[in-house]
Amino acid sequence: VYPPGREMSMQEAEEKTTDVFYRFRKRDILKENGLRRNGKRRIRMKRAYFNCILLDGTEQMEPVAHKMVLVDGEKITAIVEDTAPCEGYEKVDLKSGYLMPGLINLHVHLAGNGKPSAKPRDNAALVRRILSNGLTRAVAYRLVCSYAKLELLGGVTTIRTVGGLADFDTRCRDDAAKGKILAPRILAANEGISVPGGHMAGSVAVAAHNNAEALAQLRRAGEQGVDLVKLMITGGVMDATQKGTPGELKMKPEMVRAVCDEAHRLGYPVAAHTESPEGVKVALKNGVDSIEHGAKMDEETIRLYKERGAFVCTTISPALPYALSVSYTHLTLPTT
């Protein structure tokens, strides 16, 4: 309870909300992570998972039934027939479900839940309001953590974030590593670097007016403990000036080069939002390590990928809500 006339600071509000959250969740978190109240690990469990369809994750894998997976603590010790003896193991019936290695999601924005927006909105203005006081910041951070947990519940055990709110992604990563929350392993970029009028500028990326501002944001990201750096080199689908032609070049090649050189000097890989052939070439020629989304390739682009040792992270999941929705068919999908 605060005295009349005294306002709660952002830090106090976040700490208070966090404390309340942990008090209600502590027992569940400890149980789910196999910890005692003193933080020490419980006696490790030996479990035998049976009655499942096994996908082993190898390149030539095929679904295999009637197998049992033996797990000792956090390690898989054997894959045997369903009928094999398993004394000393707690048997877990998977009820004909699929059992497979954890998935890796290489392109995640934890600031959103993945659902398509019902109508256009000013994301930059929304983010300014969210970050304007401690209470809304704390609520937003809890939402970010809940979206990370949803990834884990969907079978994703590692995610790579490529643009988020403030330092929320690295905080979520660290809280998960400490066992405070349930989330996948996280490789975090926090806020990306964009330009005025560029993709995601003001929401999950900072608008840099010049190279000095871009490098200043890179240093801030380093202080937050990021695992990688994200650039917004071109426009995107939602902010295309002409519908159906995303990828207008926004960031100057000189800025791309400056950030990549400094990021590599500091030991960070650089991922770049690029959605046009021109943007991909600018990114690869100036040191980017991964192309996010990508565009149609020609021989020069293929050569640049090889020379740079870069890769493309294709992103088909944004279209899935539309592809899987019963309200969208070839007859009802807008064509203009």
Feature names for model-found ranges:
Residues 171, 212-312, 326:
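Histidine/acidic residue-rich metal-binding segments in metalloenzymes
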Residues 129-142, 199-213:
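Active-site mouth loops of central-metabolism enzymes
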Residues 98-175:
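Metal-associated gating/positioning segment near the N- to mid-region
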Residues 52, 69, 74, 96, ...:
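Divalent metal-coordination and catalytic microenvironments
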Residues 329-335:
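Conserved small/polar residues in nucleotide/adenosyl-binding loops
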Residues 1, 21-25, 39-86, 97-100:
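N-terminal metal-binding scaffold of metallo-dependent hydrolase/deaminase domains
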Residues 107-111, 273, 293, 330:
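Histidine-centered divalent metal-coordination motifs
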